[in-house]
Amino acid sequence: MLFLRLFIFTPFLILANCQARRTIKVGLLFVQNVSSLQVGIGYRTSAAAVLVTKNKIREDHVLDGFDFEFLWDFDECNEILGAGKTVDLLEVKKVDVIFGPTCSRPALISSALATYYNIPIFEWGLTSTRQLTDVKRFPTTLPFSVNSYSLAMAILGTLKQFQWTEFVFLYCNDGDDEKCESLKDDVQTVASAHEELSLAYTFRIQSKKLEDMRAAIVEIKKRGRIIVACVASGNGSKRTLMQAVALENANNSEYVYIMAETNSRGFVVEEVGGKWHYLWEGKFDDSDTFSTEDSRTSMANLLFLVDNMGMNNVVTPQYLNFSKNVIEMMKDEPFNCVEDCVGEEYSSVAKYAGQLADAFYAYAVAVNRLLTANPQAEIRNGTMILRNIGMTFEGVGGGDLTVDPDSARTSEIIMIGLNSSRLPETYGKLIINNQSVHFEQLYSDEVMDVWNGRQRPKAKPTCGFTGTQCPPDFVRDYLVIVIIIVMFLIFAVSAAVGAVFYAIRQKRKEIERQDELWHVEASHLKPISKKSKSEASQRSFASGPSTSTKLTVESRTETTRFIFYIYQVRNNEVVAANKHDFRPQLTDVERSELRQMRSLDHDNLNKFIGLCLNSQQLLSIWRYCSRGSLADVISRSSMQMDSFFMLSLIRDIANGLGFIHTSMLHFHGYLSSRSCLIDDRWQVKISDFGLNEVRGMDKLSTENMLWWAPEVLRGLEQRSKEADIYSFGIICSEVITRSSAFDLENRKEKPEEIIYQLKKGGFNAIRPSLLTDEALEINPALVHLIRDCWTEKPSERPPIDQVRSLLRGMNDGKKGNLMDHVFNMLETYASTLEEEVNERTKELVEEQKKSDVLLYRMLPKTVAEKLKAGISIEPETFELVTIFFSDVVQFTTLASKCTPLQVVQLLNDLYTIFDSIIEQNDVYKVETIGDGYLCVSGLPHRNGHDHIKHIARMSLAFLSSLAEFRVAHMPSERINLRIGINCGSVVAGVVGLTMPRYCLFGDAVNTASRMESNGKPGRIHVSSEANHLLTHVVGGFRTEERGEVIIKGKGVMNTYWLLGENDSVPVKSNMRKRENTPSMARSITPEI
C-alpha cells in the first residue's frame, strides 16, 4: 500500500513544490434543525469529518500544493432550500466541489444543477434514490450512500442464497411516503428481470395501526411465506408489525420476514448521544400491550438487510478514533462550533459521517490523479474528475472501500438475525456491484445457526398457503371409527367408505369440469387475419364515406390492453382478450369466483368467457362487441345522439351496475366508459368486472384513474359500491356532454394535475363540466342526479336502486326501444341526405376556386393553367426584363431584439403592404427569402419596355410606404430598404417536383443582386442598362449618376440613383422626413 501511494503521489509532489499553493473551495450542505435526522446526518456531529479527512490527505501527501476552504450551508432536506443553496454555492461562492445534500429529493435538484455547471457533486447520507446513479443523466454526480436498488439486489441475493423462488412484498407508506415506494418499484424491477424469481403479491398496509397490520397479515398468509416487508423507520412501526405477526399466528417456522433498510442497524435502535436499545425493548404508546419478551419472541423469524457504513456491524478501533476526532474537531476552524455543539445529544458522531469522510478522500485522490496526468487540467471539471475516481482504499471503518465511477460506491449489505440466545448475529455479507450481487456466507451450519435447529422455510408449503391443496388423510382422521365399525358392520363400513370416496371424486370432477369452462387454451385462440391493402383500398373506393359507428373485426388492432382473437371452441366467435401485467397463483377462492363469473348472465353485462393461463401473458377473455366502447363512440362523434338516445345508454349502464351490486361480485371496482361496451343493437354491456386481485397488480395509466372516486385515489378506502356510483356519474357526464372524461382535449390541465386536485378535494372539488349542447333537451333531474353521484362523501351518494328508479321517471312518457329510435333517426337522415349532397357539391366548387386562387399566388396564372392541363413547362428565354432586389437594412440587429414569432409578424405586416403595391403594377413576385424580396417585370407576360416603368414605380412606392409603417411591438423603430434594379436577358422555368417554383436564371439576376448589396439605405440603385431605359427609352423619371463602383464579380461599373418620377415627390424628401423623426430609427437606418 505504501509503495502504491508513493507511485501515485510522487510526481505531483514534485509539481507542487514548483508552483504557488492553490485553494480548492469545498461546498457542504447539511441538515441542522431537523431533530429526527440528527443521529444520522446532523451538521453538529458530521461536518468535522472533512477536517479529519483533510489531515489524512496531508499524511498521504495527496494534493500537497493545495489548501482547502470549506463553505457550508443548510438545506434541511428541503428540495426548494436545496436548489437555492446549491445555486448560491455555485454562482456566488464559486465552489469547486459540493458534498451533499443528504436527502434524495434535494439531491436530485442539486445534481441537475451541478451537471449544468459541470461541477463534481458527492451525495451521502439518506440519498437512497436510484436515479442518482444514472450516469447519462448525472455525469458529475457520485453517490456514496446505499440506494433502494442496492437493497433490492440484496433481497435478490438473499432469496437466491436460500433458494426461495417466490415471495410477497408488504409495505406501509404511513410516516414515510418515499422510502417504501422507491423500494417497492426497485423490487418489482429486479423481480421482473429474473425469471427464476416470482413476486407473487404486493400489498399496501393502510396505516401503521395494529388492526390494519393484522388485516394485512391475514391477507398475506394466503399468498406467501417469504415476506419482504417495508415500514417507516421509528415510531415503533417494526415492533407493531411483528406484534401483528404474532397475534395472527404467522411467526412459526413456516414464515420468514425480511426487512431491507439503509438508515438502520437492524435490531439495534440508536438514540441521540450514542445511546441505543434493542428493537423489542420499550413501548411506543399505551396501546402496545406486548411484553418485552413477547415482542422479542415475535422477531425470531425476522432477518434484517442493512448497510452499516462498511463496519460489518463491528465498531473497529479506527472508527472509534475517527468518531472521537469528529466530535472534538467541530470546535476547530472553520466550524468553531463550541456552544452549539455542547450536550449529550452531540457527543456521538453521526451514523453517516463516515460516508462524507470517504467521499472527500476519494475526491482528493481523483483530483490528484487528474493533475498528475495533466498539470494544466481544470479542477472544476466534474466529468474529468469522476473519470479518475475508480479506486479501492481503506475507509474510515477500517475495511477496504471500492468506488466505481459508473455505479458509485460498491455497496456492502449485511444480513442480521437472532441466534439461539435471541441476540443479534451477522449471518452474511452481500456485495452489490451494479447488476451483480455476491453473498458471503458467515455461518457454518445453516440449520443450527440461521434457523436455530429448524429446517429452512419453504417458499410454498407442501399443502399450499391455505393448507387446502393436500388430499384428506381418511385413514388418519377416521381410523378409530373405521376399526369400531368394521368390528360390528364390516359391510356397512365398506359401503360408507366407498360412498364417501365416490362423493369426493364426483365433487372434484365437477369442480374440474367447471374449471375447464373458464380455462381457455392459447391454442384455441386464432389471431384475426388482416385484409390486404389493395383489397381494403378497393372496398374503400367502392363504398365511399360512411357515418356508421360499427367497427369491423378487421379494423380492430392490438392495443396496449386488448388483443382480438377468433375463439375456435365457440363456433369461431370473435373475442376480446384483456392483457394483464402479472400472473398470480390462483387460490381456491379465486377459482370459485371465476366459476361464478362464468355463469353470470344479464342483458347489460358483457359475457366473461374465461382466463388464458398458458399464453405469453395472462389474458382475460370477453365477448366482442362490434361498436367498441362507449368512450370510442363518444370520441368518434359520428353518431348524433339526442336526449332519448343518451338516456337509454345511461339506463343500460345503471341496469348492468345494479345486477353487479346484487351479485357475488358486490361491486365493479374499475368502472369507466372504456369498460362500457356497445353491441350492434346499441345495447350497453358492462365489461371488465371481477378479477380484482389480478387487476390490482396491473399498471394503469393516469388517464384510467380519472373515473376513480377520490377516496380510492387517496388510498383511504378500498373499492366499493359507492365508488362505482361515483364512476357512474363521470360516465353520465361524458354521455350528456358528448366529450371524454373531464374533456381532456380542451383542458389545459394534464391528467396528473386533475388527479392531484381530485385527491386534494375540498368544498369546490374539481369535477367534469355539465355544459351541454343547447339543441339537446336534457332533463334537469338527470343533471342533479349526476351531481349527487359524484359528491365528495361516499355516504351521500345514492344507491344503485335509487338511481334506477329516478332514471325510470325521466322517460317523459316515451315508449319504444332504442333500436326503433335509431332506425327513425336513420330514416330522417336518409331523407335529408340528397340535400346535403347538393350543398356539399356547392362547397366543393367553392373550395376548388379557393385552390385556384392559392395556385395563382404561387405560380404565374399562364404557367398554372398549363400545369393544370397537364402540359409540361419548357424553359423560356426573355430577351429584356427588369429585375428588382431589396432587403431590410440592419435586419439582423432588429431581429435580435424580437422573438421569432415577432419577426414573422413584422415581415408579414411589411410584405402585406408590398404585395398590395405589386398588385397595382405589372410585376411578378418571384420569392421572399427572410428579409430579401425578389420581383421581375416583363415575364411571363411580355409588356414591351413598360417593365422598367412598372419596377421603378413599385420601388418608389415601396420607399414611400415606409414613412407610415410602424413595427407593432416596437413603435419607435423604423424600417428602411436597400433596393437594386437591373435590366437584361433571363431564362425562366418551373424547377422541382416537390413544391415547384417559377425561377429565374441569368447574369442579369446576379447583377440586380449586386446593385442591391452595393446600394445604400433608403436609395434605389440602378445599373447603367436600367438607367438607359428609364431616361432615354421610357422617360419620365429622374436619376442621378453615382459614378464608378467596384462590383464583386463584375469589376468597375458606372451606376445611378433613381430619384423619382417627374411631377412626383422625390425619394430624398421622404428620406429627410424619416431622418427627422425622433426614435431609435437612426440605429436601423444610417444617414446617407
From Swiss-Prot:
Query: What reaction does this enzyme carry out catalytically?
Result: GTP = 3',5'-cyclic GMP + diphosphate
Residues annotated as signal peptide:
1-20
Q: Which UniProt keywords apply?
A: Cell membrane, cGMP biosynthesis, Coiled coil, Glycoprotein, GTP-binding, Lyase, Membrane, Nucleotide-binding, Receptor, Signal, Transmembrane, Transmembrane helix
Pfam families from the entry?
A: ANF_receptor, Guanylate_cyc, PK_Tyr_Ser-Thr
GO molecular function: any one?
peptide receptor activity
Residue ranges constituting the Guanylate cyclase domain according to the UniProt record: 882-1012
Q: Which residue stretches belong to region Disordered? A: 529-552, 1069-1088
Q: Which PROSITE patterns match?
A: GUANYLATE_CYCLASE_1 (PS00452), GUANYLATE_CYCLASE_2 (PS50125), PROTEIN_KINASE_DOM (PS50011)
Tissue expression remark: Expressed in PHA sensory neurons.
Q: How the protein sits in the membrane?
A: Single-pass type I membrane protein
Give the stretches traversing the membrane. Answer: 481-501
Task: List the biased-composition ranges (Polar residues).
Answer: 535-552
Q: Residues on the Extracellular side? A: 21-480
Annotated GO CC locations:
plasma membrane
Going by the UniProt annotation, this protein carries glycans at N33, N235, N251, N321, N381, N419, N434
Instruction: Identify the residues that the record assigns to the Protein kinase domain, covering every copy.
Output: 535-824
Q: Which residues form a coiled coil?
A: 826-854
* Subcellular location per the Swiss-Prot or TrEMBL entry: Cell membrane
Against PANTHER family, the record matches this protein to: GUANYLYL CYCLASE, RECEPTOR-TYPE GUANYLATE CYCLASE GCY-17
Please explain the role this protein plays, according to its UniProt record: Guanylate cyclase involved in the production of the second messenger cGMP.
Q: What is this protein called?
A: Receptor-type guanylate cyclase gcy-17
